[in-house]
Amino acid sequence: MKLVIAILSLVILALVLPVFFMPEPADLAIRQQQLPWVIEARPDGNTRALGLTLNVSTLADAKTAFGPDMVVAIVSEPGEVGALEAYVASAHAGFITGKLIFTARADEDMIAAMRERAAKTEYMESTTRKATLSPADLSTAMTLPVRAIAFIPSANLDRDAIVERFGAPADEIRANDHQTHLLYPDKGLDIILDTRGKELLQYVAPRDFARLTGPLGTAAQ
């Protein structure tokens, strides 16, 4: 009898517990909008991806959406002014986990001045340098709009999974023996399919797509 009661208790618990841990409808809607393949073209030529509107949503908006552990810094290679980036090491894009990098829209003069006032500069990998912003510049950076987003999913993606979620690409460019760029100019999306490493999803406004694909030697618009 005790065994029967114990089994019934476990069954009831299994049925009831999920109700308490189900996301609120509002939270569920937000997560669905943040899924990597939910991309909305806007009348102004921008796109909304991962729940953010490129060239409109700010780094502060990105921090609100993806958590307080966002690290903001200027990342540069030798001879370059660099880019103002925000990095989230562990993020949830809807129900998909991965790493996120947000690139802020800032001109070279602003970035150079921020580098001069940096609280700390250190090497990341090889010759790449990271400049930690001063408190005042960090406050300014958080008000700047996001012009590009890069997402590295934790799980490996294959071509079939990508086409199922994003549709067939408008063009493909093979960069080397293990990387292929799947291009979606209407969405402002470049997916790098990598047979040796992690896939990379790059989002920009469609009007900026030529800048993204320029280094690939393509005329995709």
Protein language model regions, located:
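Ser/Thr/Pro/Gly-rich low-complexity linker/stalk segments immediately outside membranes or between
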Residues: M22-E40
